[in-house]
């Protein structure tokens, strides 16, 4: 059985993305990169599960979504599972792997706009907050 098939089978009943990461990312991305969603729909969407309402990617937000996907995928262990999650999530968003590979770090580039730099900081802070929450006894 290939890793991709195993991932799809286990993703139906197992969360891939940590709940704290989902919720802090939700605070950054809900109604900005994606149309408005309930918290539970966003968690399901992040974990590649069915949602009650369809998820819409906002126009011109693919670049920022790519950075979010990169950042979240780096939190998923093992690394191969993170890569597979990224590919499947991008597909759900209608973003090609070639676009992702080319643009995932653009919000980090020296010439990035102020808005993109702020977005990067927001995503980085969201992941940091989730890590701190998970380390709190």
Model features per residue range: what roles?
Residues 1-137:
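Flexible coil/loop and intrinsically disordered linker positions at secondary-structure junctions
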